[in-house]
C-alpha cells in the first residue's frame, strides 16, 4: 500500500482523464475516441470535503495495493512455469474481475461494506478514525463509486449499471508464446467469459463430452477465441 501513498490526491475526475490519455497513447482505444461525461449521480471530486478526500484517497491506495499484490502472485505462477520450461507452451489467461469497477458503496465509500449494504453507512468522522485499518484484517472497505467510474474509462457508469460498458467490460491478458507471436498485441473481437472453456478445449484438441457418468451434457455457451 505504501508505494501508492499520495498517488490519488488529484481525485477521480483527473485520474479518469489521465487514464483516457494513456489509453489513446497505447492504442487501446481509437485516437478519435471521446471521453464520456461523469453522470450527475457520481459526485465531482472537488465537491467532497477535505476529510472525505482523505478517506477516499486512502481507499484507492489500498485498492491499488491489492492489484499489485494480485499481479505479484500471478507472477509467481509465471516464474514456476518458466523454471519448469513450460511457460512458452502454456495458454495463460489472466482475467481479473467479473464486471466493471464496483460502485456499490455509493459516493461515500465504506469501511464496513456489509454494514453499508444494510443501510448503516458510517459517518465520515468514523471512517477517518479507521483510516489506518483500511486494508487490514479489521476492515472490509469498498472505495467510493467515483473511483469505479474513473477506472472504467472511457466507458460510462459502474458494475451496478450493466446496460453500459462501464458495468461489464474487464481487461484480459492472454499469453501463449509458441502460438501468439505479436507480444503486446491488441484484439478487438468481442469475447465473453463463456468463451474461456471452449478456448481451452480447442487449444488442447478436445471435444466437450456428450455424456459424463451417464448424464447427458448440455452444450456450452461461448466459442473458441483461438481464431482471434
PLM features: what roles do these ranges have?
Residues 42-59, 175-181:
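Short glycine/proline-rich turn/loop motifs
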Residues 2, 13-48:
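Long, well-ordered, tryptophan-enriched scaffold segments
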Residues 3-7, 25, 50, 79, ...:
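Substrate-binding rim/cap in mid-to-C-terminal beta-strand-loop elements of soluble/periplasmic
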Residues 5-22, 52-90, 101-103, 107-148:
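A long, amphipathic alpha-helix that forms part
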Residues 35-38, 48-56, 106, 196:
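Long, internal low-complexity/basic segments
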Residues 88-94, 172:
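Beta-sheet entry/capping signal
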Amino acid at each position: 500500500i505504501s508505494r501508492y501513498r499520495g498517488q490519488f490526491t488529484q481525485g477521480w475526475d483527473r485520474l479518469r482523464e489521465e487514464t483516457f490519455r494513456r489509453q489513446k497513447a497505447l492504442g487501446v482505444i481509437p485516437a478519435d475516441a471521446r471521453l464520456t461525461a461523469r453522470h450527475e449521480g457520481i459526485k465531482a471530486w472537488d465537491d467532497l470535503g477535505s476529510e472525505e478526500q482523505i478517506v477516499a484517497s486512502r481507499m484507492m491506495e489500498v485498492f491499488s495495493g491489492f492489484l499489485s499484490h494480485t499481479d505479484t502472485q500471478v507472477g509467481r505462477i509465471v516464474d514456476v512455469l518458466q523454471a519448469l520450461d513450460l511457460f512458452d507452451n502454456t495458454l495463460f489467461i489472466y482475467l481479473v474481475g467479473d464486471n466493471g469497477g464496483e460502485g456499490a458503496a455509493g459516493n461515500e465509500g465504506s469501511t464496513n461494506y456489509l454494514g453499508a449494504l444494510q443501510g448503516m453507512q458510517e459517518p465520515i468522522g468514523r471512517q477517518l478514525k479507521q483510516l489506518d485499518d483500511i486494508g487490514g484484517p479489521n476492515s472490509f472497505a469498498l472505495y467510493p463509486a467515483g473511483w469505479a467510474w474513473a477506472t472504467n474509462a472511457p466507458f460510462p457508469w459502474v458494475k451496478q449499471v450493466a446496460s453500459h460498458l462501464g458495468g461489464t467490460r474487464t481487461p484480459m491478458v492472454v499469453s501463449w508464446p509458441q502460438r501468439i507471436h505479436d507480444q503486446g498485441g491488441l484484439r478487438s473481437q468481442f469475447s465473453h467469459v463463456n468463451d474461456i472453456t471452449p478456448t481451452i478445449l480447442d487449444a488442447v484438441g478436445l471435444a466437450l463430452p456428450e455424456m459424463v457418468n451417464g448424464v447427458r451434457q448440455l452444450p456450452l455457451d461461448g466459442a473458441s477465441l483461438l481464431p482471434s
